[in-house]
Amino acid sequence: MKYFKRLSDRERAIFEAGITLGAIYHQFCGTPVSPGTAEEVAKCIERAALLQPCVIDARVEVDVSSEDTDNYGGYTEVSGRNLRVTIVTRCGEWEAVGKLEFIEELNYPLMWVEEIRRVEQ
């Protein structure tokens, strides 16, 4: 594709993983969730991520406890503190594994590239 001709497949796999993680974070944070709906919300996020170019696997966890929802409405929202995501992208012979997880020592929902690997086609 002409828009990516200056990128190697390796660079594009990394780019697509990062774009997908950012889209998940900024699109789904704020979504209402409860312990009874957390798994469904996570599956919805996974299915949406798999629509992104080059994404071949998406694993999402939304960790919501009953303590989080002990309030008037009985729910909380998806946030950087309760969202854990693993994305795998493939472009050509390269795969990238991207992660999103709240890191306590940083007090921050960090996105990073965990692995880049060459695969057989």
Curated annotation (Swiss-Prot):
Gene Ontology MF terms in the entry: dihydroneopterin aldolase activity
Protein name: Dihydroneopterin aldolase
Residues where substrate binds: E16, M111
Function of the protein: Catalyzes the conversion of 7,8-dihydroneopterin (H2Neo) to 6-hydroxymethyl-7,8-dihydropterin (6-HMD).
Ubl conjugation found in the keyword field: no
Family the UniProt entry places it in: Belongs to the archaeal dihydroneopterin aldolase family.
A Pfam family hit: DHNA
EC number: 4.1.2.25
Reaction catalyzed: 7,8-dihydroneopterin = 6-hydroxymethyl-7,8-dihydropterin + glycolaldehyde
GO process terms (BP): tetrahydromethanopterin biosynthetic process
Gene (UniProt): mptD
